[in-house]
Amino acid sequence: MATIKSELIKNFAEEEAIHHNKISIVGTGSVGVACAISILLKGLSDELVLVDVDEGKLKGETMDLQHGSPFMKMPNIVSSKDYLVTANSNLVIITAGARQKKGETRLDLVQRNVSIFKLMIPNITQYSPHCKLLIVTNPVDILTYVAWKLSGFPKNRVIGSGCNLDSARFRYFIGQRLGIHSESCHGLILGEHGDSSVPVWSGVNIAGVPLKDLNPDIGTDKDPEQWENVHKKVISSGYEMVKMKGYTSWGISLSVADLTESILKNLRRVHPVSTLSKGLYGINEDIFLSVPCILGENGITDLIKVKLTLEEEACLQKSAETLWEIQKELKL
C-alpha cells in the first residue's frame, strides 16, 4: 500500500549519519536544560543528547525542546537513561549532581557528588573514549579532579567551567561602576570557583588602560573607592540568587555555551577554566583550579603565563590550599 511518504519521497542514496559535533548533557535539572537551550541557540551541535536518571522529567524536557524545532535550525535531539545514547560524543557536559542548599558552600557539596560521579564517569568513557569532558557540577574544581581521576583521560580533555562565569560577573560589575559595557572591561578571576577566588586587579584594564595605573590601591583595603566590593559581589551574587530563586542557571549556561563554542569551533580563545595546576604559581599538589587556558578542538592546548603580584600569587596558593584540604580527604 502506498503511503504519503513513499509517494512524496524517492530514495536517492543510502546514508549513514555521521555526527561531527555531537554534544551530550548529563543532567536535566535547571542548569542542564539552560545549557541545552544556550547551545541550541548558538547552533553548535548537529546532535544533542540528554541523559538523566529521572525518566519522566527527561522525556518531558526533550519533548518540550523538540516542539520548538520549527522556530530554529534545531539538530536531532535525543534522550535516554541509558548512556549508550551518548556514544561517540565530541563533548560531554556534566551538570548532574546534588543541588546546592541555601547557605551551603560549594565545598560542602563535594562528598555527595563524588558518589554520583562514580556512577556516571565510567559509563561516559565506555561509550565516548575520545570525548572532551566539561564539568559544571559544583564544587566544580574538586569534581573536575574527580572526573580526571575516574576517567583516566589526559589532563587536556578534562575541563572545569571554573571561573569563566566569575570573570564574567567581575567584568559586569566593573562595567556597571564605569558605565561601560562588560565586553569592553577586561579582567580575570582565577583560583577556586567560589569563596577563595582571586581577582587579578593588576591585569584589569579598559582599552589597554590598566586601572591600577589610575589607582595603585585598587582592590585593597587601602582603596578609598573600595573597588574590593566588586569582588565581594562576585562571590556573594551566586549565594544571593540561590536564596532568591533557589538556584542559578542562565549565567552558567551562557558561560558553558561560550566554552563549548571555543572547543567545537577550535577558536583558541582564552578562558579562565579549571585545569590541573600542579607546578604553577608554587602549587605542588594535583589541584584543579582556574588559570587562563587556550581552548580548542583538543580541549586545553596551552596555558597563558599571567604575571601576578606577590599578593595575588599568595592568594592563589591559599585558594589551592583551601581545595586541597577537602580533596585530600576524598575517597575515590
From Swiss-Prot:
Q: Which domain of life is it from?
A: Eukaryota
- What is this protein's name? L-lactate dehydrogenase A-like 6A
Q: In which pathway does it act?
A: Fermentation; pyruvate fermentation to lactate; (S)-lactate from pyruvate: step 1/1
Q: Which UniProt keywords apply?
A: Acetylation, Cytoplasm, Isopeptide bond, NAD, Oxidoreductase, Phosphoprotein, Ubl conjugation
Q: Where is this cross-link: Glycyl lysine isopeptide (Lys-Gly) (interchain with G-Cter in SUMO2)?
A: 57
Quote the catalytic residue positions: 193 (proton acceptor)
Q: Does Acetylation count among this protein's keywords? A: yes
Record function comment? Catalyzes the interconversion of L-lactate and pyruvate with nicotinamide adenine dinucleotide NAD(+) as a coenzyme. Significantly increases the transcriptional activity of JUN, when overexpressed.
Q: Say which species the protein is native to.
A: Homo sapiens (Human)
Localization:
Cytoplasm
Q: List, alphabetically, the InterPro entries matched.
A: L-lactate/malate_DH, L-lactate_DH, L-lactate_DH_AS, Lactate/malate_DH_C, Lactate/malate_DH_N, Lactate_DH/Glyco_Ohase_4_C, NAD(P)-bd_dom_sf
Residues reported to bind NAD(+): 29-57, 99, 138
